[in-house]
């Protein structure tokens, strides 16, 4: 398919990417969109196992997903793939009955959501309103369910078809799924040149630029983290520098092939945040990830005896 362009998300120039230019406005929106997507995932997975009305969490997710699409793509410049890769699709859940659908509609009406056609004027307003509505969603007053984290190779971690719908299985078995966000992977990629400059004599200018890049990326989700922490209900993303420090107790930060040390760091972060049960999912042929994933399990179990990986 010679006419099909492949756009590489790489600063190393592996692909020429003809006709594709990353502008500052595009980069700004891309970072905001990743932050918003990570936040939506965190909100949905936290409340869905406890929803008072079956289907209300998915309906609320759909509402804010549409608001997000309208905010980031007001002129329909980009194709909307949200129906193709839909996080609220649960294989094994029966469709809502008319009575259940009515109760879900009533539950969302009680939240006082803005009209679907109303424009959101700022990213801060979009995130604040989204968090507030998920925090206000009526939940069952039951004991916290066992929490199961999902980490691994970036495709297998996020794509339901690649991980055999792990989230659906976890929730069907009466547990709560926890999936760390996508933004952290980009922070991991940005952090690696800093280590290489210090220990391998690589470019100090590149390392300095990466330090500033990390500060910039972290700034994009700073307000989201603040609002999530105010609720006291949702898991918070960790600083990539803190994750690197914690991973150093198990392996060298020089392990940067594939997901590298970041894979181990995510498992440590989950365990220390009350998620001792972890699915570490890899493609069969991804040897670097088997080394820093399965290869680290023995040491993680030694340091964290309550872990179940």
What are these model-predicted stretches?
Residues 1-309:
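An N-terminal assembly and electron-transfer interface module characteristic of large anaerobic redox
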